[in-house]
Amino acid sequence: GFDFHFLFTYQKPTYKKYETSVTFSSGYVGKINATGNIVAEIPEVLIELDPSYMITPALKVWTSFRYFSKTYANINQAYYFNGHWETFGGVNWQANKRLSLGCTVVNFLNQTGAKGSIAGAELITKDEAKDIKNQLMTGSYLRPFTVEFTASLKF
């Protein structure tokens, strides 16, 4: 039969009394005052839509759609990522009591972009970020379109 899982999360965790500074050997002083800022890497809205259908008692098809709203990439809120969808889908087949097979398609909508945090951006302020253009940055990215096959054998 048909099954549908839905989850809506609204959250707004903020930093409390988060002030510090660090002086580097070059003399540069990096200051952070993140008090009241939304916690980095946490979306304010998270939505999960997970329909599945058992075609037969041994064959299941499923999809998963997850929405993440705007997410800050550093604690100073100088960088952020726009909201995005992450998608998965697949087929699971219980061939017999010992063997199960599966196929999962990751990112079937072929979404592209970054997520999470940006390496080395912890101390960058909004004012400093305005002057940073055309520079290579590293971080985490959405998983690319991928097809995965699985097999599980139970003894």
Question: Whereabouts are the PLM-identified features?
Answer:
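Transmembrane beta-barrel strand/turn architecture of Gram-negative outer membrane proteins
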Residues: 7, 88-92
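Flexible, surface-exposed loop regions and adjacent strand-edge segments
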Residues: 20-29, 69, 78-83, 117-127
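Short acidic, gly/pro-rich beta-turn/loop elements at beta-sheet edges
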Residues: 16-18, 61, 73-75, 99-101, ...
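Residues that define the transmembrane beta-barrel architecture of outer-membrane proteins
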Residues: 41-47, 83-87, 143-147
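C-terminal beta-signal and adjacent terminal beta-strands/loops
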Residues: 69-71, 93-155
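Extracellular loop and loop/strand-boundary signature of outer-membrane beta-barrel proteins
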Residues: 28-37, 73-78, 88, 134-139
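Gram-negative outer-membrane beta-barrel transporters
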Residues: 1-71
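Active-site lining segments that contact anionic ligands and/or coordinate catalytic metals
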Residues: 58-60, 84-88, 98-100, 146
